[in-house]
Amino acid sequence: MAKGIMLHEVGEQVDLYLLIKSSTKGIASNGKPFLTLMLQDQSGDIEAKLWDAKQQDEVTYGPQTIVKVVGDIHHYRGRNQLKLRNIRPAGENENVKIDDFLETAPIPKNEMMDAVTQYIFEMKNPNIQRITRHLVKKYGKEFIDYPAATKNHHEFVSGLAYHVVSMLNLAKSVADLYPSLDRDLLYAGVILHDLGKVKELSGPVSTTYTVEGNLLGHISIMVTEIAKAAEELQIDSEEVLILQHLILSHHGKPEWGSPKPPMVKEAEILHYIDNLDAKINMMDRALERVKPGEYTERVFALDNRSFYKPVFHK
């Protein structure tokens, strides 16, 4: 099996199949069009430029196209980039399929869904439990398949479920240490906080924002979904309002996308847990691509910092 694109070092030549994750047209300083291609396999993704792009190239090299590329790994502005020597679409007779290039969560789907189901089962507040179970059942298929984002963290197949399960385990540890926390509320907030992304995002392959995602966003979407669930289940209680508040405030600040700051204890903890798991995922994925004694590529969402892998971390 060919070495993953993110495992190649600067200066190495590559000759392998990759999947086009996204394709964006630009105009160079000489006035000629080019395409910025994000190419991916199971190890991650890398940017490449297709210079002097023709109009037909925009169709030929669109998202979800498998291509055979030959090129060299370069380092540019803190990140590796693939300098193309040759690129062509893969033929129908070439034994490659899209699934071969998709990064997936490290835990099987059924195990993640079992874990979420168990946390819901442990809830003692019937109103919180019923709303959470209702929404997970309603969007279960998408929940287990979708990424958690288009970029930055958990942006892979089943990334949303993996993010939630990791956060649930964190929430359990925090609640064990601080028993004054309402476990049911915290667990429900974790499970539901990003569930609106199943409407905000297009799906697990070549993920983009939907019209609803661009115009409303996952926070507004889920606040509405909670209200609908409560109405369908004939639940008229304060739990509905507090669950909606947890969703509205989980980004922490207006400049980070939350209309309201956390004003309930469990909302504050949800924000911390979400932030911690996202950042650890970003660091882990960057660090696993470098050797001990090396620095990672710059991680834009972490203040554009590089991270060092200590030599003793063999």
From Swiss-Prot:
**BP GO terms, sorted:** rRNA 3'-end processing
Q: Which family does it belong to?
A: Belongs to the YhaM family.
Q: What does this protein do?
A: Shows a 3'-5' exoribonuclease activity.
Cysteines joined through disulfide linkages: none
Supply the EC number(s).
3.1.-.-
The UniProt keywords, alphabetically, are:
DNA-binding, Exonuclease, Hydrolase, Nuclease
Q: Which PANTHER family does the UniProt entry name for this protein?
A: 3'-5' EXORIBONUCLEASE YHAM
One Pfam annotation reads HD
Q: Does the keyword Kinase apply?
A: no
Q: Where is the HD domain?
A: 163-279
Cross-referenced HAMAP family: 3_5_Exoribonuc_YhaM (MF_01427)
Any GO MF annotation of the entry:
3'-5'-RNA exonuclease activity
SMART domains, per database record: HDc
> Enzyme group, top EC level?
hydrolase
SUPFAM superfamilies from the xrefs? HD-domain/PDEase-like (SSF109604)
User: NCBIfam families from the entry?
Assistant: PRK13480.1
Protein's recorded name: 3'-5' exoribonuclease YhaM
What is the source species?
Answer: Bacillus licheniformis (strain ATCC 14580 / DSM 13 / JCM 2505 / CCUG 7422 / NBRC 12200 / NCIMB 9375 / NCTC 10341 / NRRL NRS-1264 / Gibson 46)
Fetch the InterPro entries from UniProt: 3'-5'_exoribonuclease_YhaM, HD/PDEase_dom, HD_domain, NA-bd_OB-fold, YhaM_exoribonuc/phosphodiest
Give start and end residues of each DNA-binding region: 14-90
